[in-house]
Amino acid sequence: MFLARHERSAHHPPARTLAGRKALRQSTLERRYDFHLGEAFRAALQGSHDKAAGHSSQALLISRELYAGTADPTRHQPELAAALCAHARYGGSGWQAIAMLAESAGHYAALAETDPMAYEVPRIDVLTRIALASDAAGSTPDAIGLLHEVVGMYLKAPAADQEERDLGLARARFHLGGCLLKTGMDEDGLAETEAGLELAADVLDRLRIRIADNGWLAEAPRYLQLAAPDWAAAAVRSMTLHAEAGRWQQAATAARAAIGVSGGLAGLGGDALRDAHEKISARAEEILAMRNGRGPRGTRTRSV
């Protein structure tokens, strides 16, 4: 009789044992998700895009399993939304990326209905990514239209972290500026870029972050780290355009931002980022010299 009971229990483990195994499996998946998504971000910041795509793919697979494997799918909806956005950025291309971003935006929209303070900004962030994907697919006018809408959304969005929201707005302005410049609207494009740079600098001040050395970005919030590549590119674009027009004071302001932000990225590691920082710094130092009245060979120049 004992053996019969033992055999039955072996074939049909108690419900609490099954629940415990399921909870352990879910906990393991959650840890693996956090690991792969974090590694995707880290690899992307270091310029290892293939590695970032591999990790974001794993994070997406895990998030789908978590989302499908619970009685309350909304519990893991944020993970799925974030993983879709990340993999669209690092592993997607063309309309495939836009499809993943649209799915991500749908999840964030549902989440924002119940908790706008937590999820409205991430929803708008995804719309920025959709605009960039549209631009990459050749639909720059559509991207410009969406980015104009996105800027307006950020300005009205509730946010648990106002600095994160405002840095998202700065990134949208960076990209809007780039798209406008691409279509020949130079004055408007530069104005949007400048507005983004000023807002990003203001966020740094509010966070009390000082760009003292190349290690500053490693201690910054994740959202600031992820914005840094777009920020550095915008600063380089601004300093270049102002320098070409002989506006040395404005060029110098952008040059200092370009040195600081590209230096922060270089401090995160990776030969490509260090090489980029060296090239950016060399050009920025030339611009700063011109601003201070010294030409390439020590000749005096007149500031504008």
What are these regions (language model features)?
Residues T17-T28, S63-Q77, Y108-E120, Y154-D166, ...:
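Flexible helix-coil transition and linker loops at the boundaries of alpha-helical arrays
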Residues Q46, H87, G91-G94, I130, ...:
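Structural motif corresponding to the intra-repeat A-B loop/turn of tetratricopeptide repeats
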Residues L268-V304:
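Terminal, low-structured helical/coil segments at or just beyond the last alpha-helical repeat
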Residues R32, E39, L80, H87, ...:
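Structural register within alpha-helical repeat arrays
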Residues S27, R32-D34, R75-A82, A118, ...:
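Residue register of alpha-helical TPR repeats
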